């Protein structure tokens, strides 16, 4: 008889919504895999987009991090919005650098707000008692 690990696992992925608002076929396939020990948590947009829009505090932190990476970019001097950030993060190299710099910054931040789908994934794996 095969024995299986009963460890819980959570997958966090983008929903990649279609034009009609439904989640993508890929996201639906992931959701269809859910079982008692597997939970799929879907991001409304992308991680960066959702983190930025989560709170004004997040916006300030993320703007500051991106400005430090691209100090010479003029259109980042004001309070740029999520669309501007997402356009700037088009290249995977830029996304990776931004993620690393944001991670470093968050080591010293007192607070940073995360979307509910991330909290749900963490609480599924490690429920608070």
Q: Where do the language-model regions lie?
A:
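Acidic, divalent-metal-binding catalytic cores of TOPRIM
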Residues: 1-129
């Amino acid at each position: 008889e095969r024995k299986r690990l009963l460890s819980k696992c959570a997958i966090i992925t983008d929903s990649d919504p279609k034009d009609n608002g439904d989640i993508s076929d890929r996201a639906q396939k992931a959701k269809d895999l859910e079982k008692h020990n597997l939970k799929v948590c879907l991001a409304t947009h992308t991680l960066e987009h959702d983190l930025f829009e989560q709170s004004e505090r997040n916006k300030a932190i993320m703007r500051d991090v991106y400005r430090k990476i691209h100090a010479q970019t003029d259109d980042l001097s004001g309070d740029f919005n999520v669309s501007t950030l997402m356009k700037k993060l088009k290249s995977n190299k830029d996304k990776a650098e931004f993620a690393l710099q944001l991670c470093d910054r968050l080591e010293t931040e007192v607070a940073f707000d995360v979307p509910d789908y991330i909290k749900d994934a963490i609480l599924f794996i490690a429920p608070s008692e």
